[in-house]
Curated annotation (Swiss-Prot):
The lineage of its organism: Eukaryota, Metazoa, Chordata, Craniata, Vertebrata. The cytochrome bc1 complex contains 11 subunits: 3 respiratory subunits (MT-CYB, CYC1 and UQCRFS1), 2 core proteins (UQCRC1 and UQCRC2) and 6 low-molecular weight proteins (UQCRH/QCR6, UQCRB/QCR7, UQCRQ/QCR8, UQCR10/QCR9, UQCR11/QCR10 and a cleavage product of UQCRFS1). This cytochrome bc1 complex then forms a dimer. This is Cytochrome b. Its cofactor is heme b. It comes from Hemigalus derbyanus (Banded palm civet). A ubiquinone binds at H201.
């Protein structure tokens, strides 16, 4: 068995990635989220495939086809809610994974980090298009508002929006193409994830101390496979608690009303995992400025490696930087809350302050903390 594992061309790749992979002996549970993201992706592809067998991407029948899945298809309701809530867990794991990378300085693996950012954008695009497919009120108006942001691009904006819509408004053509892209993107994400792992295995994993762990490596299997199974069981438990007890907890009640272009919902808002970016978008009165801030709120991750001023890689032994990191986390929670609130006083002011804080912490306070810590350690 050992010989086949180490000699067969295909088995050798699996062996070097998941079995005999030399792994630092001190990585914590924060390193569990990579494998959980892989599980989430597989789960989403499988549930999505079964949903696509019964879904129709036509404005006249999309909403009723989703109802049909929930009422008439065998276990359709559980597949539908596993897919919807699976997306929420996917994003929870994503945010934890990115946060861990920022805290422990994993962004110094520049190729792995940049492909990770590309993966984040791809998953966000997929989730947005998936939210449009049930063709409820929030699906329709969410699609209208978000695609309309492209009209802020000077000169070509309006043409670009109409090209994406396939007409003069969000309609049948838009829904059909969103379904096509929503179906193909997870496979592109899978390919990107494989490249993400390829680059990670070129350097080996980082560890909480941020120091080289070449002296102390252990095989991935059985030590971390068994550790990952615990994370997997917890993930499935949380997912099934959500699906079986409160499947609509994270959804919007407006999406149970069929899409109506003549009736605008009082508060148009995206799913909870986009609310932080939506709050940043809304905090700037200018349309183009808001769109740029929205893009930069994610793209700022790409310049984090350039802003690393500390002589230590990880934040494990840097209390000042730790304070800044947790301040950023609290700030993101405030932005998420504000994104779901109506545009009125005092939420507008809180949103603007939180948006300013978000960019200030990342661009100014964190690099300054690193410099101060270097001086305190007389480096």
């Amino acid at each position: 068995m050992t010989n086949i594992r180490k000699s067969h061309p295909l088995a050798k790749i699996i062996n070097e990635s998941f079995i005999d992979l030399p792994t630092p002996s001190n990585i914590s549970a924060w390193w569990n989220f990579g494998s959980l993201l892989g599980i989430c992706l597989i789960l989403q592809i499988l549930t999505g495939l079964f949903l696509a067998m019964h879904y129709t991407s036509d404005t006249m029948t999309a909403f009723s086809s989703v109802t049909h899945i929930c009422r008439d298809v065998n276990y359709g309701w559980i597949i539908r809610y596993m897919h919807a809530n699976g997306a929420s867990l996917f994003f929870i794991c994503l945010f934890m994974h990115v946060g861990r990378g920022m805290y422990y300085g994993s962004y110094t693996f520049s190729e792995t980090w940049n492909i990770g950012i590309l993966l984040l954008f791809s998953v966000m695009a997929t989730a947005f298009m998936g939210y449009v497919l049930p063709w409820g009120q929030m699906s329709f108006w969410g699609a209208t508002v978000i695609t309309n942001l492209l009209s802020a691009i000077p000169y070509i904006g309006t043409n670009l929006v109409e090209w994406i819509w396939g007409g003069f408004s969000v309609d049948k053509a838009t829904l059909t193409r969103f379904f096509a892209f929503h179906f193909i993107l997870p496979f592109i994400i899978s390919a990107l994830a494989a490249v993400h792992l390829l680059f990670l295995h070129e350097t080996g994993s980082n560890n909480p101390s941020g120091m080289s762990s070449d002296l102390d490596k252990i095989p991935f299997h059985p030590y971390y496979t068994i550790k990952d199974i615990l994370g997997l069981l917890l993930l499935i438990m949380v997912l099934m608690l959500l699906v079986l007890f409160s499947p609509d907890l994270l959804g919007d009640p407006d999406n149970y009303t069929p899409a109506n272009p003549l009736n605008t919902p009082p508060h148009i808002k995206p799913e909870w995992y986009f609310l932080f970016a939506y709050a940043i978008l809304r905090s700037i009165p200018n349309k183009l400025g808001g769109v740029l801030a929205l893009i930069m709120s994610i793209l700022i991750l790409a310049i984090i490696p350039l802003l690393h001023t500390s002589k230590q890689r990880s934040m494990m032994f840097r209390p000042l930087s730790q304070c800044m990191f947790w301040l950023l986390v609290a700030n993101l929670l405030i932005l998420t809350w504000i994104g779901g609130q109506p545009v009125e006083h005092p939420f507008i002011t809180i949103g603007q302050l939180a948006s300013m804080s978000y960019f200030s912490i990342l661009l100014i306070l964190m690099p300054i903390s690193g410099i101060i810590e270097n001086h305190l350690l007389k480096w």
